[in-house]
Amino acid sequence: MEFVTALADLRAEASCPICLDYLKDPVTISCGHNFCLSCIIMSWKDLHDSFPCPFCHFCCPERKFISNPQLGSLTEIAKQLQIRSKKRKRQEEKHVCKKHNQVLTFFCQKDLELLCPRCSLSTDHQHHCVWPIKKAASYHRKKLEEYNAPWKERVELIEKVITMQTRKSLELKKKMESPSVTRLECSCTISAHFNLRLPGSSDSSASGS
């Protein structure tokens, strides 16, 4: 409640008494009150001799106002705080039971459903495993990590194999591009790389005999 009150006071301080919106290009007049530059210009548009304050009716002797950049910065802060306050309120509303208007603090393991204290004691979940949200979150996070662990290991293994094969292919390419390597040596190197037997090799001849 203190935050809400402080935010309301800040908004009042950062609002223009004429348009009742946040101050735009705030200026201060002789009596000390602040207005949007465009609002005070329009308010004094047809005046010539005296210029009354639209808020306190003090008669300013001349059409004079001073730019107030500090108040402009304060206005921007007030805007951001209000936006955050609205977001926080929406988030809090999402975590409140629509039926009992109580905060959702439990989790039903069977129905996979968030519950408020009253829902957790209802007959709908009477014989179900109901845990506090923090305990349920920790449990399911651990289960998810255990499920992902084997897949993570497989991915790492595949990456290692790909890296090794890429390195071997580069080595083979360099060897084949070397001018001192004969065609037979190239064939033998390729066969060894892919674990193949060359036609006409001793094993092939032996099997044919």
Swiss-Prot record:
The keyword Metal-binding applies. It comes from the Eukaryota. Coiled coil: none annotated. Pfam families: zf-B_box, zf-C3HC4_4. A zinc finger (B box-type) spans 92-133. GO terms for cellular component: cytoplasm. SMART domains: RING. The keyword Metal-binding applies. InterPro entries: TRIM/RBCC, Znf_B-box, Znf_RING, Znf_RING/FYVE/PHD, Znf_RING_CS. One of its GO terms (molecular function) is ubiquitin protein ligase activity. This is Putative tripartite motif-containing protein 61. The lineage of its organism: Eukaryota, Metazoa, Chordata, Craniata, Vertebrata. The gene is TRIM61.
